[in-house]
Amino acid sequence: MKLTFLGANHEVTGSCTLLEAAGQRYLIDCGMEQGKDVYENQPFPVAPGEIDGVLVTHAHIDHTGQLPLLVRNAFRGRIYATKPTAQLCSIMLRDSAHIQEFEAEWKNRKAKRAGAEPVEPMYTVQDAEAAMQLFRGMEYNTKIELAPGLVIRFIDVGHLLGSSSIEIWVTESGATTKLVFSGDIGNQHQPIIKDPTTIRDADYVFMESTYGDRSHGPRPDYVGELSRILQRTFDRGGNVVIPSFAVGRTQELLYFIREIKKEGLVTGHGNFPVYIDSPLAIEATRIFKDTDPDCFDEDTRALLAQGIDPIQFPGLQVSVTSDESRMINADRVPKVIIS
């Protein structure tokens, strides 16, 4: 058995580890380095065509963003992820590919003026769509034999819808070794998704530790603080603009705002409008709505059992096109804009 750390070992992004065991080569995650020019990402140190498969912990781009590049370079194995992760990757990888194409087009306009050589995008939308054809949606808590001597299991880790730690059992020369790749570990008591599952035993654990030495203190009163901000801003005729990650954070905000409206915590403004001004966030919200309720926490499942959509409420509107986004500016009613 051999492990090679290809990313995120001296930095936060670009998670990617090569496991060579039981005659197989598997990547655990295949993330994009972020925070610098993506064209400076290094080529794979192992030929993509020689990789048997990829195990994905969750859909964030720093864990999945190079999957289309892997496929572009002749990878034809399977990509294993939970079903919600596969669904989220279908929109996030396509969105990332659009960005790669746009960035390449912008660089080439500059290159043409300077007489420089054109550049190719890291990957294209076509590459992202090809990568999605290789995904296999897995259930939580179910052991899967990838090959003789190589067994895996996805365990809910409460970071993002579909996120997981991956347990791997490697059997070689009659001895079995258990590895755990933590993925990103979520906090307790987050809305919508379940709390992280505790894994009881392992021979080796490889874990994310970005916040490993931080004491976060008591959980903030998000609903109370947000309702006070909304009340104060609406009372003076203003709008509340919330920049938000499209996947995960936007849905948490919708959950909190539904509770604020239900409890009447903002007074004098009726069913104030809330706009989702992000096509990616709109698609992600649809995936949340279509996900198996078993992926959600007890409170969310209880709402669904009563026929209550936990991230839907009166006054929620979406803007998909640029014209619809511009129309928000013409609406003088105090509102929330999530973008």
Task: Kindly label every feature range from the protein language model.
Residues 1-55, 64, 71-252, 258-267:
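His/Asp/Glu-rich metal-coordinating catalytic cores
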Residues 229-339:
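Hard-cation-handling environments
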